[in-house]
Amino acid sequence: MEVVEVLHMNGGNGDSSYANNSLVQQKVILMTKPITEQAMIDLYSSLFPETLCIADLGCSLGANTFLVVSQLVKIVEKERKKHGFKSPEFYFHFNDLPGNDFNTLFQSLGAFQEDLRKHIGESFGPCFFSGVPGSFYTRLFPSKSLHFVYSSYSLMWLSQVPNGIENNKGNIYMARTSPLSVIKAYYKQYEIDFSNFLKYRSEELMKGGKMVLTLLGRESEDPTSKECCYIWELLAMALNKLVEEGLIKEEKVDAFNIPQYTPSPAEVKYIVEKEGSFTINRLETSRVHWNASNNEKNGGYNVSRCMRAVAEPLLVSHFDKELMDLVFHKYEEIVSDCMSKENTEFINVIISLTKIN
């Protein structure tokens, strides 16, 4: 499985689409806003750029993508008015892997721009937008061309399934039953990928450029902690139920692993300091409930739809597409039972960085 070819959120605007099932991600963007705001204010008030080049890495599609743009434009507009400056030209780069539904994203752009003008008037910008398909673990932009890099809920995804994890039987991710070699392989891949991410962004950002990165993580130093692995453990249970029913072969589940690593703040800090291109301004964690909706009765249903929007393309690349309704129906039942007994939350790691040279 080539991750770059199959990793993307469900496209379009249907019932299982990411656009309609990304309330958790929206809440996280809103929770992170004070950190984003401070980073952008510091950037603008130190450089006062006439053109502001911003990249959203792992942008996906839907309202959340435009929420980020709206936040950043409003922050800059408020700050430049304080100083009596003319509005800069905004250049937004939307980056994601090639399988992302860029068509749906750009079809929504006109309505978004019209709505933004209604809220903040006609005096800002102009704004320019481009799509940049490709892996953010490679070079994406010309040298020193960016002022600001933003990424939310993307950097926990790995560039590939780690090597040497064939013995992770019965699991689809790191779990308490995973051999130590599997845990080490996951961390090794994460360290390689995040180091590359920092290296390439340091080449693309100008001196004093900022990054605000939010990713799924954990507070515990145990990489198999329930706070980061449980959501995938429950999906493995759903798949294994279909094995018991003879609908999926056991070896198919054994051969499937999620290309993701959810780091602790200490691991993030260690890699940033080791790579050496950035100073850390802030490094924090936050929590958000699995069910971001206010409707507690349908918690399992909401979580199942959210996870389907995220994970279905990966699953379809390995399992029969016709089984997806059944997989996520079983997943909904398992998640509902779990949520009735336990407090279920995602842990977010947020880091604000400044490029040194």
UniProtKB/Swiss-Prot annotation:
Q: What keywords sit in the KW lines?
A: Magnesium, Metal-binding, Methyltransferase, S-adenosyl-L-methionine, Transferase
Q: What does this protein do?
A: Converts benzoic acid into the volatile ester methyl benzoates. This scent, mostly produced in a rhythmical, diurnal manner, attracts the pollinators.
Regarding tissue, the record states: Predominantly expressed in petal limbs and tubes of corollas.
User: Where does the chain bind benzoate?
Assistant: 25, 157, 260
What pH dependence is recorded for this entry?
Optimum pH is 7-8 with salicylic acid as substrate. Optimum pH is 7.5 with benzoic acid as substrate.
Name the reaction it catalyses: benzoate + S-adenosyl-L-methionine = methyl benzoate + S-adenosyl-L-homocysteine; salicylate + S-adenosyl-L-methionine = methyl salicylate + S-adenosyl-L-homocysteine
Q: What is this protein called?
A: S-adenosyl-L-methionine:benzoic acid/salicylic acid carboxyl methyltransferase 1
| Annotated family | Belongs to the methyltransferase superfamily. Type-7 methyltransferase family.
Q: What are the BP-aspect GO terms?
A: methylation; pollination; response to ethylene
Q: What is the E.C. number?
A: 2.1.1.273, 2.1.1.274
Against InterPro entries, the record matches this protein to:
MeTrfase_7, MeTrfase_capping, SAM-dependent_MTases_sf
Q: Where is this site: Involved in substrate discrimination?
A: 150
From the UniProt record, give the pathway where this protein acts.
Aromatic compound metabolism
Where Mg(2+) is bound, by residue? 168, 254, 256-257
- Single GO MF annotation: methyltransferase activity
